């Protein structure tokens, strides 16, 4: 790989010695560097360059020999879409609602994705098709595949991502590899493991030699899964080598900064989706050509390792810093390379909320010495059921061994219930995060320091994860659906035609929107750059706009002779959610939730918050009372309160109250509340109710037949839970997992009680 890179680097180094070095003026005259991202899915630091002797990763290892290996690089979220959302915005996803899996968040109007800023500064920006940013609605954003033009990216060509640019135009290209994804490492007995072994030959991994972490059983199933995962890593390493060689063969390597990184930890149990090191610590290797070495930190040299703490929220400002572009104030990360680099950070912050169909809420922070975790829903077990995770053979094996009581203490921790409210781990002596020190008196000072810092951070960013997802969705879309960007309009300072032509500018009534335009009949949309556009006879100018998180506007048209009329912003009367979430609300919720870890019985304190005006406060208070009411007297008092709460204006509060009532045997009151929630127009309300039913074992039978409700369009998550419930109740499907839209419609025409895209032969009438 990179056959000539070292030789060329050596020649350049010699020439530098002869000429002493680049002067400051030379550095200022350098063109902006190209930047190439090579991202892999679901990988921890299981590479040769990180000291993993089981790994066969020659291409990434060689990249590391010429680059910097970051030993303390972290994804801020342990699951793909929230992690990528953080990457692309430079903001913590939990500050704008992107921390849940598969959501449509609405950032502030001023926010731009960093590739937009690079493109505006003159970069040619490409992405090979992996977006997953949790912000956009329509296919036009971020990439209009039909037109070839778009609001963010120039194109999405994988084979030659930097082709298509003008001359020496600098480029930023993203190439994503998916073979290491959790789904592929679970493909035991699918035929792929045999195919990849044939492809790798002697590089294939022997399961017997696999290194098994202490939190997983050291048995054949685990070893086979780890071996297949490493085979996929080696296979993807070869693909990465092809890209790097192509970069060199194009003559671009000496002008291109290369980032290799993984989107979060590996896909085995207790990795992906959890905030342990196995879930958030990722590989990061950065190669900077010698001519751009001034963009590194002082003392950084090729072929070295650094223990500097960096995280995904830092990537966006770092890209802008490397390109010499100003960093917007709204970005919450800090650049660690480039013109605007900041001193190394002391903390990395991590978060996890809903993972696929299953709710939880965890926050944490990492230093070089400790990992601190805060479980905001400690009454939930770690090992909740998540469909994708349950398909993994190692997860199936783990559950079987747990049922048979064959797990040791470290392995069985994954099934601990309830979870500890706080966790603290010594990273040097306990790299796998097994021994929780939170209740060890020797670490009280450290625990208090990290707890306080995590609370300060949540307040600094106004962490909206404290707001139940159904309530937050209603803050975003009171009418139950997203806002549409206003249709662009045209302006001109020249009312008289010049040579039969006119220059027009394009405006959008929705602030924060980006505009694209084209002439009618053209296949390509162009990003509008605020420069006038000439419209001549027989030409029709078309324009459309999109604000991040909004639907794309309707197309506007202009031709000579048309009146120049301003359009209106459809969202003008909509109060943005940012004005509904304030410091007072966040502080009040955190004050309430501090009862979780305070010593003593605080049941009475939860009641003090039950009549709060703020819906999220009432929600958390209801949950606290449900989980702390254990005696007959306590349950009797709570029952009376919860009866009244089933009429609360908030669906989330009603569902939580119904949860408690069903828990205490009052199905006659709880059941109608849950049934009504399943018919709610908001997807998140339905999913909240489904999560309650999923925790009830045989009790969901009390709610059958389920009402007919709309499909969950955000990722079929309600459908997944429905499938689990029916299977648990012994209802045998013909094909419970997959159904086409036509099959769904046919079934609905046959059975009035069928609700989601399921197929079965059971009559519920």
Describe these PLM feature segments.
Residues 4, 23, 445-452, 465-597, ...:
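Short, compositionally stereotyped local motifs that mark structural "simplifiers"
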Residues 613-614, 649-650, 681-682, 714-715, ...:
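Short inter-helical turns and helix N-cap capping residues of alpha-solenoid HEAT/ARM repeat scaffolds
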Residues 565-576, 598-611, 632-646, 667-677, ...:
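Amphipathic alpha-helical scaffolding segments comprising HEAT/armadillo-like alpha-solenoid repeats
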Residues 2-9, 15, 21-417, 431-452, ...:
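Formylglycine-dependent sulfatase
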Residues 582-600, 608, 616-633, 644, ...:
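Structural detector for internal amphipathic alpha-helices that build alpha-solenoid repeat scaffolds
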Residues 332-333, 464-473, 736-742:
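Short, flexible loop/turn segments with low-complexity composition
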Residues 361-363, 423, 504, 531:
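Residue-level detector of beta-strand structural context in well-folded domains
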Residues 420-434, 461-462:
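C-terminal substrate/ligand-recognition segments
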